[in-house]
Each structure stands twice: as structure tokens, then as C-alpha cells.
Amino acid sequence: MLFGNTNADSRTDAIADREGISASLADLRNRMSAGDQLAVFLLGHGTGTDEEAKFNLRGPDLTGAEFAQLFDAFTEQDLIFVNTTSASYGFSTALAREIAGEGRIVVSATRSSSEKFDPYFSRYFIEGLSERRADRDKNSRVSLLEAFNYAKNNVEEFYEESGRLAAEHAGLDDNGDALFALSPAPGQGDGSLAEIAFIDASDAGETGLSAIRLALKRRMQTLERSVLLLRGRKADYLEDDYWTQLETLLIDLAKTTEEFTREASE
């Protein structure tokens, strides 16, 4: 879905005001299934500081907490928010706190309220998705972590080559603590979920797969995600319970992978 200031543009699905966004999200929620992923990209302008920072819309603007409330019904879906606006940090922090939970990722183009100029982050983020330029591991997919790192690294190079002091520093939160890591990496607080969250088109590697192998591949991806989420919540479990659940998931993943491989030879 694409939201804009008017309906004059045929590419626009609805006007970018609270009513238009809310109605469109309600319709979208009815068409989504449990386990689906929704990616939301904020392109435009932001104003204000700290958690009172707002995303500029047609009509009343919204704070991060108010924006998060529009997604209250998406309890069974994974949510990704990429905020590329000016004054994005305060808005993103409030948003991250409000929607905190499993399967939630928030990217902010800036790391502090003092970084309030229009960021270059969106330019390179979109570039990373174009022709899968950010696909560092060459698996024909672009994960959110790959797109984030591509944009972040290119922004840094842009300022260095321009001889200017960097006016923006992007951050990512995917563990629900609303603290944005500047260098997220799997196993280091933030980055594990973003590594397996893909935001490009369907996997080119799925072309030609039978219905059975496609279903098995999707199950493998679901199990891999469950393992990562469980590892991230280890501190919430008793030692024996944690290892029992992890063992169950890993055995299921191994069996599914074996079946996927066996189907290829038949």
C-alpha cells in the first residue's frame, strides 16, 4: 500500500491521514494470516524531539505511540518499521516501546533528537533493495539486516567523501528493549531477528520447487525463526525447560531439512 497527500496519483492507495491509514490497515488485517509479515516504510518528514516527535501527515500528526496503536490488531503478524524521516529517533523510540514483543523490528535513521535534518539513509536503503545490491551472502534474498548495513555503510562513506561530519547515525532494535544498536549483529542483543526477516520479493530460489518442497522450505524457515526467538529469551526460562524446548525445535528442524533434501532426489 502507498499513502500520499492526495488521490491524484494513481499509485496512491489512500490519503496519508489518520483515517485513511487506519481504514486501510483494518482492511489489510482482514486479508493477512497468522505468521505473515508486514513491513512499514516511513518516508517523509518528522518534527519535534524525544518521544513527542511526530510523523507529519495530512491533518493531525502522530507520535510514535499513537502510530503504534494503529497496529494493535496485528497480534499474530510480524511487524517491521523502517523510519527514514527527519527527527526519527524520538518517534521510533516511542513506537518501539509501544509495540515491543516477539517479531517486532524497528529501524531509525537517526540515533538522537539532535539529528533532525533529512537523512540520506532512505536513499541507500532503497538502493540496497534495488537489484538485491545489499545481498551480501548471495542467497538471492535481502534481509532487513543486510539492507540496514548496506544503507548505514553507504551513509558513512557519503559523509567521509564529502568531508563532512556525519549528521545521522541509524540504529536497529529487534529484541524489544527500545534501545537501538548502531552495529547490530546476530547474538549481540539486536540483529538476530533482522537477519532472518526478508523484505524483498519472493525467494528466487523457490522457482521450480514442487508444492511439497516449497511447504517444507517454509516450515524450515519457521523453525529457524523459532530457534532464534527461543535463544533470545533464554533468560526467561528454567534451564531444563529451555534445553527441552530447544532440543524439540532442533530435532524437528533436522527432520524437516532431511525430508526437504530427500524430496529433491525423488
Predicted ranges, named:
Residues 1-266:
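Cysteine endopeptidase catalytic domains of the caspase/legumain-like
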